[in-house]
Amino acid sequence: MTTKRKAYVRTMAPNWWQQLGFYRFYMLREGTSIPAVWFSVLLIYGVFSLKSGPAGWEGFVSFLQNPLVLFLNILTLFAALLHTKTWFELAPKAVNIIVKSEKMGPEPMIKALWVVTVVASAIILAVALL
């Protein structure tokens, strides 16, 4: 059986996500994947430069000193921090921790995740510099 009625198609503008702050922040957070791809490609380039010997490594280090590359790496750092912040805020919603018959709030878990991140980063930095 076919119908002669036209299907209702709701119009949607290409910039629909710009109307609400929630959607703008969501798009910004999802956009942090682009700097992550940049950093992944940069790491792969560094590994292959290291494989090619001292001359290749020196070329990679001079590439890293380019102001544009430095700017992209700083942008990538901020994108990674934003992504980390949003995931750390999401973690307490996925886990119910009950202490003395009361559900623990999200703040202790978020703070603990940041402490672990800072400690792990400090250890990695110390090992790299020693």
UniProtKB/Swiss-Prot annotation:
Choose one Gene Ontology CC annotation of this protein and give it.
plasma membrane
Question: Looking at the record's lineage, which domain of life comes first?
Answer: Bacteria
* A GO term for molecular function: succinate dehydrogenase activity
The transmembrane residues are: 30-50, 60-80, 110-130
| Subcellular localization | Cell inner membrane
Q: Which residues form the signal peptide?
A: none
Q: Which UniProt keywords apply?
A: Cell inner membrane, Cell membrane, Membrane, Transmembrane, Transmembrane helix
**Predominant location:** membrane
Keyword Transmembrane in annotation? yes
Q: Name one Pfam family in it.
A: Fumarate_red_C
Give the bilayer topology. Multi-pass membrane protein
Q: InterPro entries, from UniProt?
A: Fumarate_red_C (IPR003510), SQR/QFR_C/D (IPR034804)
Record has Lipid metabolism as a keyword: no
Q: Which family does it belong to?
A: Belongs to the FrdC family.
The record ties this protein, via NCBIfam families, to:
PRK04987.1
Q: What does this protein do?
A: Two distinct, membrane-bound, FAD-containing enzymes are responsible for the catalysis of fumarate and succinate interconversion; fumarate reductase is used in anaerobic growth, and succinate dehydrogenase is used in aerobic growth. Anchors the catalytic components of the fumarate reductase complex to the cell inner membrane, binds quinones.
Instruction: Note the HAMAP family from the entry.
Output: Fumarate_red_C
The entry describes its oligomerization and partners as:
Part of an enzyme complex containing four subunits: a flavoprotein (FrdA), an iron-sulfur protein (FrdB), and two hydrophobic anchor proteins (FrdC and FrdD).
Identification of the protein by name: Fumarate reductase subunit C
Q: Which organism is it from?
A: Yersinia pestis bv. Antiqua (strain Angola)
Q: Gene for this protein? A: frdC
